[in-house]
Regions:
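Extreme N-terminal basic, low-complexity initiation segments
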Residues: 2-6
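Aromatic-lined, polymer-binding surfaces characteristic
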Residues: 113
């Protein structure tokens, strides 16, 4: 039937200050691929705290959903992406050791997946943007589309945050990893992540697009600044050339992440050394 406009077919929001609501499917799928290859004891930890592992897979990105406008919670998420990750993981794992905190351990294993995938892929994604091939967020959401199609999901109808469970008890665990962000703000962020990513899935012939356009205009936002970043009905042509390299980086990161998560897992027993691979930023 009718060709749908870009705003009807995606789940990505950017406000006028430039905060990006990231795509989610690649991180979810990556976490499942890594989980399948982990030793049985690590799998057991994740199984017992699966909801926290799944939230962890989105790393600091959950904070991007706190509010559409600029705010300190979202800024904390932005700052985390620019900082070297090692100190965060060492501090988190020292708490796991001190308090025998298996829930926090599961969350940090998910967070480790997020860090490994971001730091493996972002240098290439950023280079494609700098060279004018394709904007960063457009390439990322097109990668989500490719992965959805490869795994039999329909990008227009699949709810990418279906595995995210917002609960105050989970927010309390996450707060132990990010003590500078209040528990209630973490809870709001996870709740908003689920709401917004699911809200933007196109399965209603544009009704939600019209609603969000009205909400944005009431808040003084430009609907155009949002709409230009939604997933389009057809694949974006500029994404085709860089896609094989991005897929290669993604695939290679899976076995690498399995090995480095095993290393992270050893810190539950003692203050062991974390290798240099943990000392990059989320941008590589």
């Amino acid at each position: 039937g009718r060709r749908r406009g870009p705003a009807e077919t995606g789940y990505m929001i950017r406000d006028q200050e430039g905060t990006v609501m990231p795509t989610t499917y690649a991180h979810d799928l990556f976490g499942r691929e890594v989980y399948r290859r982990l030793p049985s004891d690590m799998k057991g930890v994740i199984r017992r705290h699966g909801d926290l592992y799944r939230i962890g897979l989105h790393g600091p990105d959950i904070l991007f959903y706190y509010m559409v406008s600029k705010n300190p919670v979202t800024q904390f998420g932005v700052d985390m992406h620019r900082e070297k990750a090692k100190a965060f993981f060492k501090e988190g794992m020292s708490q796991v050791r001190r308090n025998k905190d298996e829930a926090l351990l599961a969350y940090l294993l998910g967070f480790g997946c997020h860090y490994m995938l971001d730091s493996a892929c972002h240098p290439y994604v950023n280079r494609m943007a700098e060279e004018g091939v394709i904007p960063h967020i457009v390439l990322e959401k097109e990668f989500d589309r490719v992965l959805m199609e490869e795994t039999g999901r329909d990008p227009d109808h699949y709810y990418p945050a279906c595995g995210i469970v917002p609960r105050m008890e989970y927010a309390r665990v996450i707060h132990r990893a990010m003590p500078l962000v209040k528990t209630v703000n973490i809870y709001i962020s996870v709740k908003m992540m689920k709401l917004l990513t699911n809200f933007m899935v196109c399965d209603d012939h544009g009704r939600k697009r019209r609603i969000i356009g009205k909400l944005l205009s009431l808040g003084g936002k430009s609907a155009g600044s949002v709409i230009e970043h939604f997933m389009t009905a057809e694949a974006v042509e500029q994404a085709k050339a860089p896609m094989p390299e991005l897929e290669r980086l993604y695939r290679e990161a899976i076995p690498e992440t399995v090995e480095y998560l095993k290393e992270l897992y050893t810190l539950r027993e003692g203050a062991y050394h974390l290798s240099a691979r943990w000392n990059r930023t989320y941008n590589g």
